[in-house]
């Protein structure tokens, strides 16, 4: 059976379709059972169809699906409070994917710089081997030119330094830098763990320069490193954290987490309960 031509060929899909799954196993159309090593590419943190996840989704789906951000969302507040209680962050913004989380993190960093008199601080420093998503801006944050090929001019304001090399960072850091964006463990770059002490040095240099540190935990976060967040393995507190994948266990959700003063720089930017002419 061939893949439907109605689907854009954006991915090199294997011609296997699964009908259901349980725990670590998937079952294909022909009944063949597979041990799932991919886990939805670091998404299915609790396996397939975990009873508690199924129960939570079915319960909520039977009560209310969507209201918009015009109103309080109690369940959203509950999750945000749990994330804050178990991290160095104070504020949480929810989105739908990892790319939205990383791009949102960059927006928050630049907005914070702008709100604090640093309008010239727009540059984001990234590392070689980095992968931060596939939105137009994040294509520029990624290191590999292949990802950017054919998509026109790259978004401005991204500089790459050698992964693990502090000296290359020191050569480009300056008052034009809004933030350093880093994966504690690179995924697309080959499952590379940051060298011992590297994150601590990044954090120190960012602080000395008045820049922010963004920890991209989209793939490595939510317990995959042995701690809830990978940054917790070193004595640092990033200013912003990008989160997704395992956060929803298969349900599409991402989050931008930030320190209070950083997150508050973007408050009421898009909508307000007040009338427009008030």
Regions found by a protein language model. Name each.
Residues 5, 33-119, 123:
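Glycine-rich loop-to-alpha-helix module at the N-terminal edge of alpha/beta enzyme cores
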Residues 136, 227, 235-266:
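Active-site PLP attachment segment
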Residues 270-277:
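Conserved small/polar residues in nucleotide/adenosyl-binding loops
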Residues 192-226:
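Catalytic PLP-binding core of fold-type I/II PLP enzymes
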Residues 80-179:
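PLP-dependent aspartate aminotransferase-fold enzymes
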Residues 1-22, 70:
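Active-site-adjacent loop/helix segments that line or gate small-molecule/cofactor pockets in enzymes
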Residues 177-190:
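Short acidic, glycine-rich surface-loop motifs adjacent to enzyme active sites
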């Amino acid at each position: 059976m061939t893949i439907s031509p109605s689907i854009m060929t954006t991915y090199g899909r294997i011609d296997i379709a699964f009908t259901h799954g349980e725990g670590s196993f998937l079952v294909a159309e022909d009944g063949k059972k597979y041990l799932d090593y991919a886990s939805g590419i670091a998404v299915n943190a609790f396996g397939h169809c975990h009873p508690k996840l199924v129960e939570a989704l079915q319960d909520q789906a039977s009560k209310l699906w969507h209201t918009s951000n015009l109103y309080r969302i109690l369940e959203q507040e509950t999750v945000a409070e749990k994330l804050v209680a178990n991290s160095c962050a104070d504020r949480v913004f929810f989105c739908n994917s990892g790319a939205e989380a990383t791009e949102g993190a960059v927006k928050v960093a630049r907005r914070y710089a702008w709100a604090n008199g640093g309008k010239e601080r727009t540059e984001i420093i990234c590392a070689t081997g980095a992968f931060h998503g596939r939105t137009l801006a994040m294509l520029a944050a990624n290191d590999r030119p292949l990802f950017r090929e054919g998509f026109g001019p790259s978004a401005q304001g991204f500089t790459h330094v050698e992964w693990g090399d502090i000296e290359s960072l020191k050569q480009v850091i300056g008052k034009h830098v809004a933030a350093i964006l880093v994966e504690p463990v690179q995924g697309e770059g080959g499952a590379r763990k940051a060298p011992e002490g590297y994150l601590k040095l990044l954090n120190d240099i960012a602080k000395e320069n008045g820049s922010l540190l963004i920890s991209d935990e989209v793939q490595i976060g939510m317990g995959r490193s042995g701690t809830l967040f990978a940054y917790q393995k070193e004595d640092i507190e990033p200013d912003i954290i990008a989160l997704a994948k395992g956060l929803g266990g298969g349900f599409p959700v991402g989050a931008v987490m930030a320190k209070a003063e950083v997150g508050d720089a973007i408050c009421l930017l898009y909508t307000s309960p007040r009338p427009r002419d008030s």
